[in-house]
From Swiss-Prot:
Organism listed in the record: Sulfurimonas denitrificans (strain ATCC 33889 / DSM 1251) (Thiomicrospira denitrificans (strain ATCC 33889 / DSM 1251))
Name of the gene encoding the protein in the UniProt record: pfkA
Protein's UniProt name: ATP-dependent 6-phosphofructokinase
Binding site for ADP: R155, G186, A187, E188
Keyword Transit peptide in annotation: no
Active-site positions on this chain: D128 (proton acceptor)
Catalytic activity: beta-D-fructose 6-phosphate + ATP = beta-D-fructose 1,6-bisphosphate + ADP + H(+)
Biological process according to GO: canonical glycolysis; fructose 1,6-bisphosphate metabolic process; fructose 6-phosphate metabolic process
NCBIfam families per the UniProt record, alphabetical: PRK03202.1
Gene3D superfamilies: 3.40.50.450, Phosphofructokinase domain
Similarity annotation: Belongs to the phosphofructokinase type A (PFKA) family. ATP-dependent PFK group I subfamily. Prokaryotic clade 'B1' sub-subfamily.
Cell compartments where the protein resides: Cytoplasm
Function field: Catalyzes the phosphorylation of D-fructose 6-phosphate to fructose 1,6-bisphosphate by ATP, the first committing step of glycolysis.
Length: 319
């Protein structure tokens, strides 16, 4: 019987636990012995590896985060620690790994594969949805729902007090969360890192809207824009003339009960990952495209920066 392990690396997302649950179920279904690696690549080095069973994943499908824990391992970037990790896997006869993470995690795992021949398949897992080669990453739908609920709640109080609210989403280099949540929440302004902006260009329009009876504004910004959220709020007060508040959603976006869509995508991602490893695709990332699931190698994933969908960007012109 072959042995296969799973770990989560980097930022956690809702959807990891459903993926972990199905990993155990589908591995056993295929005659494999499933193992958990705790605390990401750190767990490979520290030998925090245990055999998994159905009882270990009972009741986790509705939980956010990851029961395995996660980490950003600097030690795994060093060859001597990767050698320790290989010895720990060899002791348990594990030669296949599934990695829930981002492109940094996949690059580290690709080095490990080239050095030691441990086969792996990556499942894109980041709420930023910024991995090149896939149009969807695990956790994004749940994060968008968390953001949507927050904006809806903030709109209630904004309208009651005639205020503007600047709502900051995650997305240091990618404005996907801010843009999609703006479109789906009726925001009056959206600012993202990918698109240059000049706040003064909005002043006349905003003042005119207030003159015509608008009582509040919802402004959604990505954390990666050139101005911080406090500066946007100060602009609204000083130049537009409306009392303003800032809400930074922060790590709330990573939590929450996994949505139906993320549970379904977790199921599909895991199926394709295990099938790939059993089908002798030794080093790949499962990507979701407009035509379905495909496997891409790490060089293809990391060769260029993720770009927002041009159609989505075209909608930004409405703001």
């Amino acid at each position: 019987m072959k042995n296969i392990a799973i770990l989560s690396s980097g930022g956690d997302v809702s959807g990891m636990n459903p993926a972990i649950k199905h990993f155990v179920e589908y591995a056993l279904h295929n005659g494999l012995t499933p193992y958990f690696v705790y605390n990401g690549f750190e767990g490979l080095i520290d030998n925090k590896i245990t055999k998994a069973s159905h009882s270990d994943v009972a009741g986790i499908i509705n939980r956010g985060g990851t029961i395995l824990g996660s980490s950003r391992s600097k030690r795994f970037m060093l060859k001597n620690y990767r050698e320790v990790a290989k010895k720990n896997l060899d002791a348990l006869d594990i030669d296949m790994l599934i990695v829930l993470g981002g492109d940094g995690s996949f690059r580290g795992m690709d080095i490990f594969y080239k050095e030691h021949g441990v086969k792996f398949c990556g499942i894109p897992s980041t709420i930023d949805n910024d991995i090149n080669g896939t149009i969807y990453c695990l956790g994004v739908d749940t994060a968008l729902n968390v953001i949507k609920d927050s904006i809806d709640n903030i709109r209630d109080t904004a309208s009651s007090f005639s205020r503007a609210f600047v709502i900051e989403t995650m997305g240091r280099d990618c404005g996907y969360l801010a843009l999609v949540s703006s479109l789906c929440s009726g925001a009056e302004l959206c600012l993202i890192p990918e698109v240059e902006y000049n706040l003064s260009s909005y002043e006349d329009s905003f003042k005119e809207q207030i003159k015509n009876g608008r009582k509040y504004f919802i402004v959604i910004v990505s954390e990666g824009i050139k101005d911080n959220s406090k500066e946007i709020a100060e602009w609204l007060e000083q130049k537009v003339g409306i009392e303003s508040r800032v809400t930074v959603l922060g790590h709330t976006q990573r939590g929450g009960t996994p949505s139906i869509y993320d549970r379904l995508m977790a199921y599909k991602f895991v199926n394709h990952a295990i099938d790939a490893l059993l089908g002798d695709i030794n080093s790949s990332v499962v990507c979701y495209s407009k035509t379905g699931f495909i496997h891409k190698d790490i060089d293809e994933i990391t060769s260029q920066k993720y770009m927002l969908d041009p159609e989505l960007l075209s909608y930004l012109k409405k703001f």
